[in-house]
């Protein structure tokens, strides 16, 4: 979680190798790293693959650069595409992207465009989250400074559009906000729902 791709990859490699020295890893272990588009380099991606990281997840959020700027994201959609290419060149074949709906000023058409674009990228997994404005957060305190949030009808339509477009692209929903191609369901996500044991480090 967080943005581990922001730090030197040697630290990630040393951490994974330390864990391998302390624990027995299954031969088909799934190790995921979260990346902020724009922070991934060829060197980092190669280091991740070399130490056994075999799944990468990008916090894309939207394909609309205006939306990304409004959200205060440091990346553009073009940065994401570049990071996606880097990941694939390094050898990643299990790639996920996070997108968001019900954002300030976001129309159903805006969100549909993002979904259609993401569905055509050849990803194995998509996490589609609906914005929830929590009290005592920066967004809650400054909501008046943003465009209006979508109404309930639009938010409901965004939910249905997510189902329709991703299903049409071969994804199935296996958890509340997560969609995967067959065989690419996140083991980390599934472990929560199946109440399996895990260690938080």
Protein language model features and the residues they cover:
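C-terminal scaffold of the Radical SAM
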Residues: 1-201
């Amino acid at each position: 979680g967080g943005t581990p791709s922001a730090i030197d990859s040697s630290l990630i490699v040393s951490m994974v190798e330390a864990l391998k020295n302390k624990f027995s890893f299954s031969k088909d272990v799934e190790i995921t790293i979260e990346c902020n588009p724009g922070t991934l380099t060829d060197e980092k991606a190669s280091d991740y693959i070399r130490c056994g990281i075999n799944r990468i997840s990008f916090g894309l959020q939207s394909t609309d650069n205006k939306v990304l700027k409004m959200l205060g994201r440091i990346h553009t959609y073009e940065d994401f595409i570049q990071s996606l290419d880097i990941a694939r060149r390094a050898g990643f074949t299990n790639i996920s992207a996070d997108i968001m709906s019900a954002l300030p000023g976001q129309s159903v058409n805006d969100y549909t465009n993002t979904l259609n674009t993401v569905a055509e990228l050849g990803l194995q997994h998509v996490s589609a989250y609906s914005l929830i404005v929590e009290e005592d957060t920066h967004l809650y305190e400054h909501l008046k400074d943003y465009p209006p949030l979508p109404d309930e009808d639009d938010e409901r339509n965004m939910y249905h559009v997510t189902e329709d477009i991703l299903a049409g692209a071969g994804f199935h929903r296996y958890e509340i906000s997560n969609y995967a191609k067959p065989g690419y369901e996140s083991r980390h996500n599934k472990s929560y729902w199946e109440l399996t044991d895990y260690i938080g480090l």
